[in-house]
Amino acid sequence: MLSAFKLHNNRLSRLELDESDDLASSLWVDLVEPEEGERERVQTELGQSLATRPELDDIEASARFFEDEDGLHIHSFFYYEDADDHAGNSTVAFTIRDGRLYTLRERELPAFRLYRMRARNQTLVDGNAYELLLDLFETKIEQLADEIENIYSDLEALSRVIMEGQQGDEYDAALSTLAEQEDIGWKVRLCLMDTQRALNFLVRKARLPSSQLEQAREVLRDIESLLPHNESLFQKVNFLMQAAMGFINIEQNRIIKIFSVVSVVFLPPTLVASSYGMNFEFMPELRWSFGYPGAIALMIIAGLAPYLYFKRKNWL
């Protein structure tokens, strides 16, 4: 899908893209999973080459942040959750050339959707491509901060479940949720660090106006303040995982203890019963009139004696 926006009274206004000269008046050209015809239109009308899918997947810094004859290029991760609530990071290719911002992405992203909603009533200060880029990065950082807050809330709820000593099935669910929260935290951290590198590159390479330079530094300060919070999440997740595993081990030890008690109580009587159950001809006890009750009494004594002894020694 191809969308374009122009500046009207210092606000973004969406273009209908019916006329061939509409793109030439645009300030921001946004492409989401573009078809080949849309790529060709951008190339024909604006002379702009767009990144390919393999180029979006490159992770080395030289392929994500660079400047060439086609403009200033920044490839940056954006966080999203799909229809099944699975977290992921999607790469967005930003290009600034001739005062115009190009964005190429593979899916609709929450940060872009939120920014377009805000842009309807938001007045731009300078109304240039760099301001748009930094506004999108600001929106992304706000979204990541919200995700960190959500993880904190989820971990607080999990902490109560784990520390209150629930049943084994609830521990299994808690461990699964902890693994999911750790995965989300890792993706958020990856986004933060990637955005930090992108902004440092932008500050070094682009001749930013003073207002955008201060805006970039403000976003960098926000990232630096969020990274320690994100790191503390991993420590909290690790602590809760260890606590949950510890409680699971305690529960397993209780079960093993029950089997140990059963073994201590029933193994000696079983030995007595099996001894008198052997089919030998010369077993004098078999002819005794009190042989059966005597064997029963011996089995009871053989079961109680080791149990009481082990209990006194606190071995059970």
Curated annotation (Swiss-Prot):
| InterPro entries attached to this UniProt entry | CorA_cytoplasmic_dom (IPR045861), CorA_MIT (IPR050829), CorA_TM1_TM2 (IPR045863), Mg/Co-transport_prot_CorA (IPR004488), MgTranspt_CorA/ZnTranspt_ZntB (IPR002523)
Q: Where is this site: Essential for ion permeation?
A: N253
Fetch the SUPFAM superfamilies from UniProt.
CorA soluble domain-like, Magnesium transport protein CorA, transmembrane region
Question: At the top level of its lineage, which domain of life is listed?
Answer: Bacteria
Chief site of localization: membrane
Listed A to Z, the keywords are: Cell inner membrane, Cell membrane, Ion transport, Magnesium, Membrane, Transmembrane, Transmembrane helix, Transport
Q: Where is the motif Probable selectivity filter annotated in this sequence?
A: 277-279
Q: Name one Pfam family in it.
A: CorA
According to its record, what are the GO cellular component terms?
A: plasma membrane
| Reactions listed under catalytic activity | Mg(2+)(in) = Mg(2+)(out)
Q: Where do the TM regions start and end?
A: 258-278, 290-310
Name the Gene3D superfamilies on file. Answer: Magnesium transport protein CorA, transmembrane region (1.20.58.340)
Keyword Cell wall biogenesis/degradation present in the record's keywords: the answer is no
Membrane-protein topology: Multi-pass membrane protein
Keyword field contains rRNA processing: no
Its function, per the record, reads: Mediates influx of magnesium ions. Alternates between open and closed states. Activated by low cytoplasmic Mg(2+) levels. Inactive when cytoplasmic Mg(2+) levels are high.
Q: Which family does it belong to?
A: Belongs to the CorA metal ion transporter (MIT) (TC 1.A.35) family.
User: What does the entry note on its domains?
Assistant: The central ion permeation pathway is formed by the first transmembrane domain from each of the five subunits. Mg(2+) binding strengthens interactions between subunits and leads to the formation of a symmetrical homopentamer surrounding a closed ion permeation pathway. Low Mg(2+) concentrations trigger both a conformation change within each subunit and a loosening of the interactions between subunits. This results in an open ion conduction pathway. In addition, this results in a less symmetrical shape of the whole complex.
Subunit info?
A: Homopentamer. In the absence of Mg(2+), interactions between subunits are weakened, and dimers, trimers and tetramers can be observed in vitro.
Under PANTHER family, the record lists: MAGNESIUM TRANSPORT PROTEIN CORA (PTHR47685:SF1)
| Name this polypeptide is given | Magnesium transport protein CorA
Annotated source species: Yersinia pestis
Q: What is the lineage of its organism?
A: Bacteria, Pseudomonadati, Pseudomonadota, Gammaproteobacteria, Enterobacterales
